[in-house]
Amino acid sequence: MSYYAFEGLIPVVHPTAFVHPSAVLIGDVIVGAGVYIGPLASLRGDYGRLIVQAGANIQDGCIMHGYCDTDTIVGENGHIGHGAILHGCVIGRDALVGMNSVIMDGAVIGEESIVAAMSFVKAGFRGEKRQLLMGTPARAVRSVSDDELHWKRLNTKEYQDLVGRCHASLHETQPLRQMEENRPRLQGTTDVTPKR
């Protein structure tokens, strides 16, 4: 793990959280219980405070940053997809930000909302609870259905379970030179196949 103090502020990481060794946490960063921080994530608390609350996940290649005197917050059980950028915003409890989305300064994503992949949420946007947001700029297109929220929660549970799996078995190694016979497949802990 790459942890850096900045002007006397040291990242705080709950002992039950998992932070991938290639992730970088700088300065005023607070990571809660059971959080998953993926490979190559950058949480740069050298201006504003970054808070990742319990049970949330920040996936591979995500960036969190914010201006001075602001808090960038991912609420409890928040789900931040691969490559997303969060800058000076608040992601509500149990909300999902899709892959490669950008959420700008002062934006608030409501609880249990879903931001579709590749969306751009403008600075100052004020979302409501359980909205499906999409587009560039993003706008609310409808409410999140019960099935969609259930699917989101299953996916978040996969990452919460992955925390323990990583603590138990993830370690650096050398590659094999060829695939072994009867190579096993990894199994998740829930069925997250989207319904059609």
From Swiss-Prot:
InterPro entries: CaiE (IPR023446), Hexapep (IPR001451), Transf_Hexapept/Carb_Anhydrase (IPR050484), Trimer_LpxA-like_sf (IPR011004). GO terms for molecular function: transferase activity. GO terms for biological process: carnitine metabolic process. It comes from the Bacteria. The keyword Transferase applies. HAMAP family: CaiE (MF_01525). Belongs to the transferase hexapeptide repeat family. This is Carnitine operon protein CaiE. The gene is caiE.
